[in-house]
Amino acid sequence: MSHHDPKEALITPGAALSQLNERSRDIFRQIVENYLATGEPVGSRNISRMISVPLSPASVRNVMADLEQLGLIYAPHTSAGRLPTELGLRFFVDALMQVGDLTEDERQSIQAQLAAIGKQQSIEATLSDAMMRLSGLTRAAAVVLTGKSNPRLKHIEFVRLEPEQALVVLVSEDGQIENRVLALPPGVPSSALIEASNFLNSRIRGRTLSEVRGELEAALAQRRSELDQLTQKIIAAGVASWSGGSSDERRLIVRGHANLLEDLHAMEDLERVRLLFDDLETKKGVADLLGLAEQGEGVRIFIGSENKLFSLSGSSTITAPYRDSSGRIVGVLGVIGPTRLNYARVIPMVDYAARIVSQMLGK
């Protein structure tokens, strides 16, 4: 997409709308809808046949000149036709587009696909499967930034794997199970592992790790005489194994890359998608963008270079936050595709998918 015209930065969708009469809006809508449907520029002759009020190609050209002056459309060098600029797309999405509700069939399809996801799997696997299905429904790449995991804890256990290695198993109240492998000091008896488990279980139940971490450290300091040194070391190591781990760790899951390869029109499209693949592969900026999206309520739309965080000129991102059982925003999901996404269809799909995922995580 072009964003070369300095005027583009100076005009808001509201200001553009006030400068367009019904005829100009109709012509502009045809240019955008043709682009969303085909990816191709459209010329005045074709537009004069498409619009509701008949106009000569010459009159259409005059209106197109005005739209170009406003920075809403541009002429790609290869063609006499016109395409919307990024500003034009933003104007269309904000001011002209009718976002339809999903049909009952579409709702049921999303619900059925997401309901088919295994109940027994981890939250991460659930989200990964949900994104695979969302990418299939939207024909774009689907992304999810998993929530900061800080669940209320139910049980902790140390299981010996080898003489100097144990598995720390942490079970949360919402059924998540986290495992960490822990190096043990030489000569640790099994009784020390049991004592460490008992010490922690008497303090963590029903609370988050961040709530109890300071208290555990204080309790360890006070009870040094009662607990032998090996047990103290195991407890400290067990707590530390989580402090840099799941409580702050966020995963970015990307599914459906192949959808971005469909419908490529030219070498420049291929180059744009190659750059996008690189970004998705290295996760560069994607997590930052989704983190930004998480700060707002509802669906957010980033078109082309509005997204300053990674080289996505020519691509759009549509996101919505999802919530845990207490209604707290814990992550964000969405789709990334070409700027010619079917916005009217994809926006309600992303919104609905976020609601269904929230329901699934809330159970």
From Swiss-Prot:
**Single annotated GO MF:** DNA binding
Q: Which Pfam families has this protein been placed in?
A: HrcA
SUPFAM superfamilies, per database record: GAF domain-like, Winged helix' DNA-binding domain
Protein's GO biological process: negative regulation of DNA-templated transcription
Q: Which UniProt keywords apply?
A: Repressor, Stress response, Transcription, Transcription regulation
- Identify the domain of life: Bacteria
Q: Disulphide bridges in this chain?
A: none
The answer on whether this UniProt entry bears the keyword Transcription regulation reads yes
Which NCBIfam families does the annotation name?
hrcA (TIGR00331)
Q: Which PANTHER family match?
A: HEAT-INDUCIBLE TRANSCRIPTION REPRESSOR HRCA (PTHR34824:SF1)
Q: What does this protein do?
A: Negative regulator of class I heat shock genes (grpE-dnaK-dnaJ and groELS operons). Prevents heat-shock induction of these operons.
UniProt lists the family membership as follows: Belongs to the HrcA family.
Q: What is this protein called?
A: Heat-inducible transcription repressor HrcA
Please report the organism this UniProt entry assigns to the protein: Afipia carboxidovorans (strain ATCC 49405 / DSM 1227 / KCTC 32145 / OM5)
